[in-house]
Amino acid sequence: MSKLQFVWVGKLKEPFFRDACAHYTKKLGRFHKLDETILKDAPGKLPPMDKVQHEGKAIMARIKPSDMLICLDEKGKEMTSVELSKHLQRWTEDPNLTPTFVIGGPFGLADEVKNAARVKLSLSKMTLPHELARTMLLEQLYRAASILRGSPYHHV
C-alpha cells in the first residue's frame, strides 16, 4: 500500500469541514497509508505576507528529500478526475518518493514552497477557502483512487 502525506496549515474550524475531511480521509485510507501534519497558523498579529513566510518556513522544515512536493495553488495545473487518477498512479509508483500534498493558510503559500514543488495543482480557477480546498482535495484523491481500482464511485 503506497503512502500519501499531507501538510496543512491550520486546524479545521468548522464542524462540517471536519466531518467531511474525516469522511474522505477514512475512505482514502482504504487505498493508501496516510500521514497528516497540521501546522499552527502563524501568529495573528503578523502582517499577511509575514504570516505566509512564517508558515512557508514551517512547511519546508517538514519536507524531506524523498517527499514529492505537490502544492495547491490557484495558478497551478487544472485536471479532470481521470487525469488526476493517472498522475496519482505515476506519483505512487516510485517507492523512494512520497507524494506530499500541501495547502497553505488563508493567505496562501510562500514562494519558497511553490518553487520547491514538483507539481502545482489547482482545484479551480476560483480562489477557495483553504478548508474547502482541503475537503475537495481529499474527495478528489479518493475519487482518483477509486477510478484506478474500478470502483463504481466515479460515474463516467
UniProtKB/Swiss-Prot annotation:
InterPro entries listed in its UniProt record: Alpha/beta_knot_MTases (IPR029028), RlmH-like (IPR003742), tRNA_m1G_MTases_N (IPR029026)
The record's SUPFAM superfamilies line, in alphabetical order, gives: alpha/beta knot
MF-aspect GO terms: rRNA (pseudouridine-N3-)-methyltransferase activity
What's the protein name? Ribosomal RNA large subunit methyltransferase H
Q: What is the top-level taxon of the source organism?
A: Bacteria
Q: Which reaction does it catalyse?
A: pseudouridine(1915) in 23S rRNA + S-adenosyl-L-methionine = N(3)-methylpseudouridine(1915) in 23S rRNA + S-adenosyl-L-homocysteine + H(+)
Query: What family is this?
Result: Belongs to the RNA methyltransferase RlmH family.
Q: Does the keyword Repressor apply?
A: no
Subunit relationships? Homodimer.
Q: Where does S-adenosyl-L-methionine bind?
A: L72, G104, L123, S124, K125, M126, T127, L128
Q: What does this protein do?
A: Specifically methylates the pseudouridine at position 1915 (m3Psi1915) in 23S rRNA.
State which Enzyme Commission number(s) the record gives. Answer: 2.1.1.177
Indicate yes or no for the key word ATP-binding: no
Q: Any idea which UniProt keywords this protein has? A: Cytoplasm, Methyltransferase, rRNA processing, S-adenosyl-L-methionine, Transferase
GO CC, alphabetical? cytoplasm
Q: Which organism is it from?
A: Maridesulfovibrio salexigens (strain ATCC 14822 / DSM 2638 / NCIMB 8403 / VKM B-1763)
EC primary class: transferase
Q: One Pfam family name from the record?
A: SPOUT_MTase
Write out the annotated subcellular location.
Cytoplasm
